Design a protein with these regions (language model features):
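Conserved amphipathic alpha-helical segments that form helical-bundle/coiled-coil interaction surfaces
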Residues: 99-176, 194-200, 209-221
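C-terminal effector-binding regulatory domain of bacterial HTH transcription factors
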Residues: 1-2, 207-233
Length: 233
């Protein structure tokens, strides 16, 4: 048999495999509740964000049911459920960490080089996010446009493609399933304030301030996605 390349496996998939094995071997049975997230992360020796990515993947496989305010329960799996779409998917927290690295620099570049028309386009995208938020909608498309406008204003087409790829992952199945566990209206006001600070820094051509504002926004996004999933009552 010819030698085949060894593919690195994402941590959340390794965690998911271990939990899946515990379920298939009968350690946890359908209807049973898993230990609280904090305890389970400690037992596995992993971070809670990585564990959460694994739990979301297993929920999409119908092996688990994450009930906000109640707990994480083993379910009777649906064998017909397709999981191929998860094979190459990045975990939501991987995407957030990558966004911090890339979009912080995009914001700094935008502050240095954005034209008046580009600043107006960023403001218009920010307004669209606000309008969608007022209707209690998760303004995902408007949010994507806001961040793409910033990347475009930086004038680096390679970075624009990277941000586009990150947002393709941002809108993928793992991320979208995670968002169902969150209460978007409670996050909207903070998100909009953070966006406003980014816009202001870019408009005054403050590269350092724009980078700092974007880093703060992405850091707070990580915090919200880590904190607001309450399943341990």
């Amino acid at each position: 048999m010819p030698i085949q390349a060894v593919e690195p496996r994402r941590l959340y998939r390794q965690i998911a495999d271990q939990i899946r094995t515990l379920i298939t071997e009968g350690e946890y049975t359908p209807g049973e509740r898993l230990p609280p997230e904090r305890d389970l992360a400690k037992q596995l020796g992993v971070s809670r964000p990585s564990l959460r990515e694994a739990l979301i993947a297993l929920e999409m496989e119908t092996l688990l049911d994450v009930r906000v305010g109640s707990g994480i329960y083993v379910t009777q799996p649906d064998e017909s459920r397709r999981t191929a779409e998860l094979a190459g998917a990045s975990g939501p927290f991987e995407v957030i960490r990558a966004r911090r690295l890339i979009e912080g620099e995009c914001a700094a570049l935008a502050a240095k080089s954005a034209t008046g028309a580009q600043v107006r386009a960023i403001r218009e995208a920010h307004t669209a996010v606000l309008e969608e938020s007022k209707r209690d909608h998760n303004p995902l498309d408007a949010d994507r446009l806001f961040h793409m406008r910033i990347a475009e204003a930086g004038g680096n087409s390679a970075l624009v493609l990277v941000v586009q790829t990150l947002w393709d992952q941002r809108m993928g199945p793992l991320y979208r399933t995670l968002e169902l566990k969150l209460e978007y209206p409670l996050m909207a006001a903070d998100t909009n304030r953070e966006h406003k600070a980014i816009v202001a820094a870019i408009a005054r051509h403050d590269a350092r301030g724009a980078r700092r504002a974007m880093h703060h926004h992405v850091d707070m996004t990580m915090k919200r996605y880590s904190k607001d999933w309450k399943v341990e009552q």
